[in-house]
C-alpha cells in the first residue's frame, strides 16, 4: 500500500537562500534566530526554561539540515540526536517567496513568471477595479485600499466597517487582494460572494494576482477583534499538472487536503477537504485522515499558524513554542507511518520573526523524510522544492513532473 503524508510547516525556513539579497533577506534564518532567542533565555517563564526543545524533529535530521544550509548548527538543539530519517535542504527557483509559489513548486510546478502586485502603500488598488467590485456587489463603498497588517487594520477600521457595512480592502508585499468583514454584521456567505466577484474582476482585468483572501473576523471594539478560522483563499490554478493532479488522473488516487491546501491549489487534484484551525486541531485531523487513508493516497496538511500567528507578527517566542508543540505531537504521526509509507516534513518559504517588516523571507526549506523503507542520512542540497514532487510521482509510478530530480 502506497501512501505519502506531507506536512508543510508554513514559513519554517532554515537559512537565507542563495538569492536572498535580491529580496532584501540576506541573513534571514527563521529556525536559527528562534533557537538563538531561546538560548538567550528570551522564552524563559514559569513552566518553560532553556533552549528550543525539538527532540523529534532533531531525530529526523532538522538540526543537520539547518547546519548544511547555513554552516552553523542551531544553538541549543541536540547535536547528538540519533538520526532516523533522511534530511536535506532545498532552494526555491520560483520568482516569489509566497505561499502559492512555494506549494506549487513542492508539487513540481514552480512559478517562473512574475505575479502582479499592488505596490502603492496607499490607494493601492486601481479605481476601475474598485468601482467594478462595488457596482457588482452592490456595496455602500469600501474601507482601507492600502497595505496593512491584517490584525492592525481591524483595530483601525473594524468599528467603522460594522457601522457602515463597507468591506475592508487591503494588500501586502504578496500578490494578494484581501477582504476583511465581520462574520456577524456583514455575514460569511456575503463575504465569500464578494471574494468571488473580486476574483472574477481581477481575472478579467488581467492583473495576474495570485490570491483573493476572505478574512472574516469577530468582536465588537478595537483590541477585541480577532480573525476566525473561516478564512478562504481563491487562487488561480497551477499552470501545469501537479503531483496531486497526476495521482488523481493517472491512478484514480486520493488527495486529502487538511487546512488551506485545497485553496492553494484552487481545488485542482484534491479529492477530499478537511477544515481545521490551530496546530492541535490540524494534528487531530491529520491523524484521523492518516488512519483512514487507503492505497494511492496523499494526506497533505498545511500548518498555517507558524506563518500567520507568529512569523508575520514577528512573535519569536510564540513561534518557538508552536514548534515545541508540533514536536511534542510528532510521534503521534510517526507511529502511523506503516510499511511503504513516506512522511515528508517541509516548508513553503521563510518568515523570520526577528526580521524587519512583516513579510516572508527568502530562505531554504527543510526536507525531512521518514518511513520504514527510507534510508537515514543526508539528502544534501536540493536545487528546487520540486525535488519533493518528483520524488512523490516516482514513488507512486506516475509520469514525471516538469521540474526536479527524485531524491531517492
UniProtKB/Swiss-Prot annotation:
Residues noted as binding Mn(2+) 2 in the record, renumbered to the chain: 307, 312, 360
EC top class, as a word: isomerase
Recorded catalytic activity of this chain's protein: 2-deoxy-alpha-D-ribose 1-phosphate = 2-deoxy-D-ribose 5-phosphate; alpha-D-ribose 1-phosphate = D-ribose 5-phosphate
Cofactor note: Binds 2 manganese ions.
Gene Ontology terms, MF aspect: magnesium ion binding; manganese ion binding; phosphopentomutase activity
Keyword Isomerase: yes
Binding-site residues, Mn(2+) 1: 10, 348-349
GO annotation, biological process: 2-deoxyribose 1-phosphate catabolic process; 5-phosphoribose 1-diphosphate biosynthetic process; metabolic compound salvage; nucleotide metabolic process
Domain of life: Bacteria
Alphabetical list of InterPro entries matching this protein: Alkaline_phosphatase_core_sf (IPR017850), DeoB (IPR010045), Metalloenzyme (IPR006124), Phosphopentomutase_DeoB_cap_sf (IPR024052)
Any one cellular-component term (Gene Ontology): cytosol
Listed name of the protein: Phosphopentomutase
Pfam family, one: Metalloenzyme
Pathway(s) where this gene product acts: Carbohydrate degradation; 2-deoxy-D-ribose 1-phosphate degradation; D-glyceraldehyde 3-phosphate and acetaldehyde from 2-deoxy-alpha-D-ribose 1-phosphate: step 1/2
Family stated for the protein in its record: Belongs to the phosphopentomutase family.
Documented EC number(s): 5.4.2.7
Signal peptide per UniProt: none
Cofactors demanded by this protein: Mn(2+)
Coiled coil among keywords: no
Sorted UniProt keywords: Cytoplasm, Isomerase, Manganese, Metal-binding
Source organism of the structure: Proteus mirabilis (strain HI4320)
Protein location: Cytoplasm
Protein role: Isomerase that catalyzes the conversion of deoxy-ribose 1-phosphate (dRib-1-P) and ribose 1-phosphate (Rib-1-P) to deoxy-ribose 5-phosphate (dRib-5-P) and ribose 5-phosphate (Rib-5-P), respectively.
Amino acid at each position: 500500500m502506497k501512501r505519502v503524508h506531507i506536512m508543510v510547516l508554513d514559513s519554517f525556513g532554515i537559512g537565507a537562500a542563495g538569492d536572498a539579497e535580491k529580496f532584501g533577506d540576506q541573513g534571514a534564518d527563521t529556525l536559527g534566530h528562534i533557537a538563538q532567542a531561546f538560548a538567550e533565555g528570551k522564552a524563559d517563564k514559569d513552566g518553560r526554561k532553556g533552549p528550543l526543545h525539538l527532540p523529534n524533529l532533531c531525530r529526523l535530521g532538522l538540526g543537520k539540515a539547518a547546519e548544511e544550509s547555513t554552516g552553523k548548527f542551531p544553538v541549543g538543539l541536540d547535536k547528538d540526536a540519533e538520526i532516523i530519517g533522511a534530511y536535506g535542504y532545498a532552494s526555491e527557483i520560483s520568482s516569489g517567496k509566497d505561499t502559492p509559489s512555494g506549494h506549487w513548486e513542492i508539487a513540481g510546478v514552480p512559478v517562473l513568471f512574475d505575479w502582479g502586485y499592488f505596490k502603492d502603500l496607499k490607494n493601492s488598488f486601481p479605481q476601475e477595479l474598485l468601482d467594478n467590485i462595488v457596482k457588482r456587489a452592490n456595496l455602500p463603498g469600501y474601507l482601507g485600499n492600502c497595505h496593512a497588517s491584517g490584525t492592525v487594520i481591524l483595530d483601525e477600521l473594524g468599528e467603522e466597517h460594522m457601522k457602515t457595512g463597507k468591506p475592508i480592502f487591503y494588500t501586502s508585499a504578496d500578490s494578494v487582494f484581501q477582504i476583511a468583514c465581520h462574520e456577524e454584521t456583514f455575514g460569511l456567505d456575503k463575504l465569500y460572494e464578494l471574494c468571488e466577484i473580486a476574483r472574477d474582476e481581477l481575472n478579467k482585468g488581467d492583473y495576474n494576482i495570485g490570491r483573493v483572501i476572505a478574512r472574516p473576523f469577530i468582536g465588537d471594539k478595537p483590541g477585541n477583534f480577532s480573525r476566525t478560522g473561516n478564512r478562504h483563499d481563491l487562487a488561480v490554478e497551477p499552470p501545469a499538472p501537479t503531483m496531486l493532479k497526476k495521482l488523481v488522473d493517472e491512478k484514480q488516487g486520493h488527495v486529502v487536503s487538511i487546512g488551506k491546501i485545497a485553496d492553494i491549489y484552487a481545488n485542482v487534484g484534491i479529492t477530499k477537504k478537511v477544515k481545521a484551525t490551530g496546530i492541535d486541531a490540524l494534528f487531530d485531523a491529520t491523524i484521523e485522515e492518516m488512519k483512514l487513508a487507503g492505497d494511492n493516497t496523499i494526506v497533505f496538511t498545511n500548518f498555517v499558524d507558524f506563518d500567520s500567528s507568529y512569523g508575520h507578527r514577528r512573535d519569536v517566542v510564540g513561534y518557538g513554542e508552536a514548534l515545541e508543540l508540533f514536536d511534542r505531537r510528532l510521534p503521534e504521526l510517526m507511529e502511523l507511518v506503516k510499511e511503504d509509507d513516506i512522511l515528508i516534513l517541509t516548508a513553503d518559504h521563510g518568515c523570520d520573526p526577528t526580521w524587519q517588516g512583516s513579510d516572508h523571507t527568502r530562505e531554504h526549506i527543510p526536507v525531512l523524510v521518514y518511513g520504514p523503507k527510507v534510508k537515514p542520512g543526508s539528502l544534501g542540497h536540493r536545487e528546487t522544492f520540486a525535488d519533493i514532487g518528483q520524488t512523490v510521482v516516482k514513488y507512486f509510478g506516475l509520469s514525471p513532473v516538469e521540474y526536479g530530480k527524485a531524491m531517492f
